[in-house]
């Protein structure tokens, strides 16, 4: 069996629950009522200073340096709490690799580019993209490519290093260095690790954020007869070892994030996502490139989407904090507003539409023709179904892009967010392509 087919088949056989499977605030039966170190930390914090916002709760639970979920655990894959698209099929990463090469060509073939991934998981997606770069070596031979990974988890950065470099990459000894790990991939491309996007060197860059924005902390608000009230996390007075949601008695500063014409009864807002989008927009407007964001979410229509995942099952977000992943749907309308017209935005489009436009059917046929065994073909089709089926990932995940205005409209002036949605130039994945 062809080596590429074997890699694809191996991933297609994984059992999967995707984090966008359903929308829940986390009221399902909990897997565990244990008093975790994180729960003790949070209860002490709340008893000392008062109830905390949902955003602060998520930040502590996921990224606390001592007890955070993402800091020390490998939560991906069959033994983790969820599986992502790159873990299901290599076709996914290959098509994204083609997208980045397509944008590099369309923007004028810069002599150098940085591939920057935010939250790279196990490094699987970057590895698949790099394999495409190697296969297109004749096209990219004059381009100096470097990889820059933004990762807060030391555990995951070590796994990424093994995936990309096939060896352990030592930590940088210079305490003042913005890079905390540096190495070379199997194909000879330099790779560096950072803890913050702002630490990545500026220059022509292609940015990738796959299932990254959904784990950023959100503020939750509920409309009441007295106006908007923010949702907080407090200690349950009926059970000293449990937490509960409460409403703030009065307005809070974060209420400023709510749109004046908001009509929903419940709203989730992610200021951190806005800051990152503004940083990406400024960089792309100044030095060129593009950003591709793939996540599950909505275009300003959904309400209460915060939920937890533990062992591939839905998990109450307030039970055993620090042991389960917390996630909330991405509001793409908010991301579009935060770009502030500095760059053009495309999408969101459903994953099945994007992948079909990128030629997933053509690529699947090639792999099926090379897979001689019936079981291998069945697994390839299973992976395809998981990515494309509307009831699975096909309609739940969406793609969204940021591009320079001149890439779409032939001008350099800033435009407002509405204008950026109607490009005059075709962009792979977001426009239907004719395959010969």
UniProtKB/Swiss-Prot annotation:
| Residue stretches spanning the membrane | none
Q: Where in the cell is it found?
A: Mitochondrion
GO BP field: mitochondrial respiratory chain complex I assembly; peptidyl-arginine methylation, to symmetrical-dimethyl arginine
Q: Per the record, what phenotype accompanies loss of this gene's function? A: Embryonic lethality.
Biased region (Polar residues) positions are: 413-427
Which residue stretches, if any, does this entry annotate as coiled coil?
none
Task: Name the top EC class.
Answer: transferase
Q: Where is the transit peptide?
A: 1-41
Q: Molecular function terms in GO for this entry?
A: enzyme binding; protein-arginine omega-N symmetric methyltransferase activity
One Gene Ontology term, aspect cellular component = mitochondrion
Source organism superkingdom: Eukaryota
Entry keywords, A to Z: Methyltransferase, Mitochondrion, Transferase, Transit peptide
What EC number(s) does its UniProt record assign? 2.1.1.320
Residues annotated as region Disordered?
411-436
What's its catalytic activity?
L-arginyl-[protein] + 2 S-adenosyl-L-methionine = N(omega),N(omega)'-dimethyl-L-arginyl-[protein] + 2 S-adenosyl-L-homocysteine + 2 H(+)
Record's subunit section: Interacts with NDUFS2.
- Similarity annotation: Belongs to the NDUFAF7 family.
Task of the protein: Arginine methyltransferase involved in the assembly or stability of mitochondrial NADH:ubiquinone oxidoreductase complex (complex I). Acts by mediating symmetric dimethylation of 'Arg-118' of NDUFS2 after it assembles into the complex I, stabilizing the early intermediate complex.
Q: What is this protein called?
A: Protein arginine methyltransferase NDUFAF7, mitochondrial
- Species: Mus musculus
């Amino acid at each position: 069996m062809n080596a590429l087919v074997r890699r694809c088949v191996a991933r297609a056989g994984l059992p999967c629950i995707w984090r966008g499977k359903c929308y829940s605030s986390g009221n399902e039966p909990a897997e565990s009522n244990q008093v975790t170190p994180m729960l003790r930390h949070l209860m002490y914090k709340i008893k000392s200073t008062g109830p905390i916002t949902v955003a602060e709760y998520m930040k502590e639970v996921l990224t606390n340096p001592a007890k955070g979920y993402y800091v020390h655990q490998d939560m991906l894959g069959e033994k983790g709490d969820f599986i992502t698209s790159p873990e299901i099929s290599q076709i996914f990463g290959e098509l994204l690799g083609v997208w980045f090469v397509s944008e590099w060509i369309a923007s004028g073939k810069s002599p150098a580019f940085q591939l920057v991934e935010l939250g790279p998981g196990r490094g699987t997606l970057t590895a698949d993209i790099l394999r495409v770069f190697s296969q297109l070596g004749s096209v990219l031979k004059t381009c100096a490519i470097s990889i820059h990974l933004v990762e807060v988890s030391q555990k995951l950065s070590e796994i990424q290093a093994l995936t990309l470099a096939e060896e352990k990459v030592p930590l940088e000894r210079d305490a003042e260095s913005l890079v905390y790990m540096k190495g070379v991939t199997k194909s000879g491309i330099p790779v560096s690790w950072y803890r913050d996007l702002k630490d990545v060197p500026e220059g022509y860059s292609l940015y990738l954020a796959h299932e990254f924005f959904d784990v950023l902390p959100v503020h939750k608000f509920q409309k009441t007869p007295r106006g908007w009230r923010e949702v907080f996390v407090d200690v349950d007075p009926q059970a000293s070892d449990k937490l509960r949601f409460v409403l703030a008695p009065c307005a809070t500063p974060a209420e400023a994030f709510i749109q004046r014409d908001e009509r929903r009864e419940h709203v989730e807002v992610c200021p951190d996502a806005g800051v990152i989008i503004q940083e990406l927009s400024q960089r792309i407007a100044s030095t060129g490139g593009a950003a591709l964001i793939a996540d599950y979410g909505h275009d300003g229509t959904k309400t209460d989407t915060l939920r937890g995942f533990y062992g591939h099952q839905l998990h109450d977000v307030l039970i055993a904090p620090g042991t389960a992943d917390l996630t909330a749907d991405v509001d793409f309308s908010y991301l579009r507003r935060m770009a502030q017209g500095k760059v053009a935005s495309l999408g969101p489009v459903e994953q099945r539409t994007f992948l079909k436009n990128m030629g997933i059917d053509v690529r699947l046929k090639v792999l099926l023709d090379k897979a001689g065994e019936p079981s291998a073909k069945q697994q390839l089709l299973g992976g395809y179904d998981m990515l494309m089926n509307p009831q699975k990932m096909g309609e739940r995940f969406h793609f969204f892009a940021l591009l320079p205005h001149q890439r779409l409209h032939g001008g350099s002036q800033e435009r407002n967010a509405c204008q950026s949605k109607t490009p005059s130039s075709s962009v792979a994945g977001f426009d239907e392509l004719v395959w010969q």
